[in-house]
Amino acid sequence: MLKKMLKSYDYSLIFAIVLLCGFGLVMVYSSSMITAVSRYGVSSNFFFMRQLFALIAGGALFILMALFPYKALAHQKFQKGILLVSVLALISLFVFGHVAGNAQSWFKIGGMSIQPGEFVKLVVILYLAAVYAKKQSYIDHLLTGVAPPVVMTLIICGLIAMQPDFGTAMIIGLIATCMILCSGFSGKTLVRLVILGGIVFILVSPIIYLNQDKILTEGRLARFESLEDPFKYANSSGLQVINSYYAISSGGIFGLGLGESIQKYGYLPESHTDFIMAVIAEELGIFGVLFVIFLLGFVVIKGFYIARKCEDPFGSLLAIGISSMIAIQSFINLGGVSGLIPITGVTLPFISYGGSSLVLLLGSMGILANISMFVKYSENKKKKEPLAPKGMKKKQLKKTVYL
């Protein structure tokens, strides 16, 4: 049986993930080697070694989650436990959190930085998938079905936004929206939910208005202002986007060559994180960019295909949530690099430097691989199962065939 299950894994998905991680590791070294020495005063391979360590840890988690039956993740006690730990971790950040980039979003443990918000993304996906799978029979009941998980998600998003980390809060909100829309409720319930959301927004509007200076800080307003014409703000909020444009245009079709980027020499401060795609464009040209987009697109499409094929509501919603996370995060990062949307500090999945993000993504991909394995295994089992002749029950057929 184990042999059959191992044969049922989607190895095209696994191969795409391996390619993304390997390519990402190479680009983290290329984009961070100058920054590490000139800006942080550490060895040129400092960020590379940290990313490699995260990749090993994430790879181990991927294997564990790929072998672990995903249905066990829907257990009520497990769900309550991870949700409680997540909320307590987010609250603890206000007391013990380390401030970096104007956000108190990290726990500093020794020489390591852990960002709980990254892991909360997966917790919310697991929670929503389990709750909505369980509520399928009464999901159209607004107050007992669809609404309570929405409230819980809003509380989590609120705690993250207060750090303030609006990028992560926005991603979780968008993932939740995708999952809620795919949870199976009727059009009438959607209308009721929109009305309820409108009422809640009206009620919290005075709080938003009174705290608008904290929400819309000078830096955030500047990002929106520079969106229309970054060259107008070339010495302030538009600087990173302009240097990103220079990197993309310098790369052209074939690029300047691996390791030959000019913009990573202090012109792009976040060359190994938010703006790593600009360095890829500069060094490897349009072919490098298309290679990454193709692989990310393949993973997302494969994820939604697995969700469509999965007959189990929990597995299907889980695959939708994981695929949505990759798609949304990729779009926000690429939109910021190309100047289509304001810069949010969101990294590019599998490619950008970031240990917490990489471990979370590989753990999520392990779950997706496990779902795909069960889907394929079930399909193969159905194909091999003989059809019962008219008037004969399935159990009788099994006895007839195998005795």
From Swiss-Prot:
It comes from the Bacteria. The chain crosses the membrane at residues 14-34, 52-72, 81-101, 109-129, 142-162, 166-186, 190-210, 286-306, 310-330, 331-351, 355-375. Residues 35-51, 102-108, 163-165, 211-285, 352-354 are extracellular. GO terms for cellular component: cell division site; plasma membrane. Signal peptide: none annotated. Pathway: Cell wall biogenesis; peptidoglycan biosynthesis. GO terms for biological process: cell division; cell wall organization; peptidoglycan biosynthetic process; regulation of cell shape. Pfam families: FTSW_RODA_SPOVE (PF01098). It is a multi-pass membrane protein. It is found in: Cell membrane. Residues 1-13, 73-80, 130-141, 187-189, 307-309, 376-403 are cytoplasmic. Its EC number is 2.4.99.28. It catalyses: [GlcNAc-(1->4)-Mur2Ac(oyl-L-Ala-gamma-D-Glu-L-Lys-D-Ala-D-Ala)](n)-di-trans,octa-cis-undecaprenyl diphosphate + beta-D-GlcNAc-(1->4)-Mur2Ac(oyl-L-Ala-gamma-D-Glu-L-Lys-D-Ala-D-Ala)-di-trans,octa-cis-undecaprenyl diphosphate = [GlcNAc-(1->4)-Mur2Ac(oyl-L-Ala-gamma-D-Glu-L-Lys-D-Ala-D-Ala)](n+1)-di-trans,octa-cis-undecaprenyl diphosphate + di-trans,octa-cis-undecaprenyl diphosphate + H(+). Keywords: Cell cycle, Cell division, Cell membrane, Cell shape, Cell wall biogenesis/degradation, Glycosyltransferase, Membrane, Peptidoglycan synthesis, Transferase, Transmembrane, Transmembrane helix. GO terms for molecular function: lipid-linked peptidoglycan transporter activity; peptidoglycan glycosyltransferase activity. Induction: Expression is regulated by YofA. Belongs to the SEDS family. FtsW subfamily. Peptidoglycan polymerase that is essential for cell division. This is Probable peptidoglycan glycosyltransferase FtsW. The gene is ftsW.
